[in-house]
Amino acid sequence: MFVTSMSAAEKLSIKDITSGKFAAKTVNGINPIEGTDTYARISDDGKRVDSYSFKTGKKIATLFDVDNTMGKKIKDFDGYILSPDGTRMLIQTETERIYRRSFRATYYIYTIASHKLARLSDGDKQQVPVWSNDGLQVAFVRDNNIFLVKLLYDNAEIQVTKDGKRNEVINGLPDWVNEEEFGFNRAMTFNADGTMICWLRYDEQRVK
């Protein structure tokens, strides 16, 4: 039996509860690095992506640092997506929320060895970028259409679909109902060797 004296009790306020004062501490942006016994995570100050050993929990290296890039410069970032081979990452910035799980953002391609940072696209913000398995292509959605960026061709950008239109046709993204009910925000992927893209196409033209 545990007894707590009234003198030691503290009053709880609505502000304490809603401010996150009693929220559990979490670690953001953890991703295993494929083919290794290490993982990557965003630093506590939100300025870096560091790698750590699963065995020891100790930091091994800094993979990305906003203050140490060649080419483009950014002040901060909201997330990252490692390439399957672990040599590059997509850096997510200027995030704009849409629904519960969906958002658009400005992405950059970062090469870890050279510290080179370059825009994924010179167009408007992108959604749900995904790497090909060889890490040499990135597909993304903009304005309900799918685009492809080829890294070996000087980041050449190709528009894959052209029929996407708000409230009519959606390529590569779930509609709001599917996003909400099934809990996903991307509806496209590469095949194993990166020669094809498979996606869902939603036609809402007859939806009232």
What are these regions (language model features)?
Residues 1-7:
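Hydrophobic h-region of N-terminal signal peptides that target proteins for export
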Residues 8-208:
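Beta-propeller folds
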